[in-house]
């Protein structure tokens, strides 16, 4: 049994439960019980059907109010399928509802129309019916993971415990984990990497959606070792040339602080262990290695424009889940093309 605090009714299961561990420094306000028979696992009662797109959700808040979590899952979870548990760390300045997205009406906040993570997830589920996709939205109270880490004692330990505890809730599904994030959300991913001696075997994909500001050379060894562990492990990095952007009369980022610089540094570091092929056209520079296990896509920016969230909106989140798979095909979607998920946007 896992003791975690969430402000919802107790979950009930038909078989006996067991104590697993107590989530230190990030205790939620309710009890969740892990069903111990995988063959007959039930989904927790605390989830509520959304009434849209055959989904169910549960909102979770830690007792100190520092992290808000929303877990979204399909109602037709099949325990015979492979399950991907996606941890999506929110970008700076965004709420969970903005990040999910919806069809906007006059007067709506513009943030509702710039990511559409919910609709992109629905498109992924529609396209890949052989796998389960459970999505975990993670929002820091400051709406900034870098600020949260700076102001939270033992932040690395808390990040790891959050990932471990939420993963344990779905133990009967033996999920594979995807660490994903946009903008400052990359700080959450690096927080997890810094918290572990070795990237765990259940991490099957890491995606930085213009979010690798925090990359340092110290991370390369762990990433290289993880990529060598399994051909199933995949790394995707999306970035644009933010080094040429002038905003309000000043450079948007420092010469070494943007994702353009950090992504190229990561590619150079990884090239010490892996042979890359590089292609360029008028729009992108693409670096690949290990037959698509590693893909780093850098958008050129001759006009000095801001493409920060557009990389996510224009099918970037879909790419983050499908890169290196049979679904990474133009007949299904094009990165930086038209939004293929319009039909899946909630009213």
Residue ranges and their predicted role:
Residues 39-85:
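A domain-start/cap signature at the N-terminus of enzymes
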Residues 171-183:
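Alpha/beta-hydrolase fold nucleophile elbow
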Residues 75-123, 127:
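Short, surface-exposed "cap/lid" segments of acyl-processing enzymes
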Residues 197-286:
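The feature captures the conserved acid-bearing segment of alpha/beta-hydrolase catalytic domains
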Residues 142, 146-170:
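Alpha/beta-hydrolase active-site loop
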Residues 181-192:
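Glycine-rich nucleophile elbow surrounding the catalytic serine of serine-hydrolase chemistry
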Residues 249-347:
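C-terminal accessory extensions appended to soluble enzyme cores
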Residues 99-108, 130-153:
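Cap/lid segment of the alpha/beta-hydrolase catalytic domain
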């Amino acid at each position: 049994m896992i003791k975690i605090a969430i402000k919802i009714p107790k979950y009930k299961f038909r078989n006996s439960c067991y104590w697993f561990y107590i989530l230190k420094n990030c205790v939620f306000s309710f009890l969740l019980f892990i069903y111990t028979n995988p063959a007959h696992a039930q989904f927790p009662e605390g989830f509520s059907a959304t009434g849209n797109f055959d989904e169910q959700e549960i909102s979770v808040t830690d007792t100190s109010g520092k992290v808000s979590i929303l877990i979204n899952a399909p109602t037709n979870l099949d325990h015979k399928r492979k399950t991907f548990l996606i941890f999506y760390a929110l970008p700076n300045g965004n709420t969970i509802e903005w990040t999910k997205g919806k069809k906007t009406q006059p007067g709506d906040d513009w943030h509702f129309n710039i990511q559409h993570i919910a609709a992109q997830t629905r498109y992924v589920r529609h396209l890949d019916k052989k796998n389960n996709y459970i999505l975990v939205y993670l929002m820091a109270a400051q709406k900034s993971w870098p600020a949260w880490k700076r102001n939270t004692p033992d932040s690395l330990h808390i990040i790891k415990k959050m990932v471990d505890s939420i993963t344990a809730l779905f133990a009967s599904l033996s999920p594979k984990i995807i660490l994903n994030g946009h903008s400052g959300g990359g700080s959450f991913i690096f927080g997890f990497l810094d918290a572990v001696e070795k990237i765990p075997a259940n991490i099957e994909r890491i995606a930085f959606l213009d979010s690798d500001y925090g990359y340092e050379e110290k991370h390369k060894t762990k990433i290289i070792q993880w990529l060598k562990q399994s051909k199933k492990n995949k790394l995707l990095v999306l970035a644009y040339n933010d080094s040429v952007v002038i905003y309000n009369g000043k450079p948007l980022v420092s010469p070494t602080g943007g994702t353009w610089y950090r992504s190229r540094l990561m590619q150079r570091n990884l090239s010490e262990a892996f042979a890359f092929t590089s292609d360029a056209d008028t729009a992108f520079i693409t670096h690949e290695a290990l037959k698509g296990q590693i893909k780093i896509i850098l958008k050129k920016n001759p006009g000095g424009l801001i493409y920060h969230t557009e990389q996510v909106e224009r099918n970037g989140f879909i790419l983050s889940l499908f890169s290196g798979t049979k679904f990474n095909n133009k007949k299904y979607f094009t990165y930086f093309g038209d939004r293929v998920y319009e039909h899946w946007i909630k009213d």
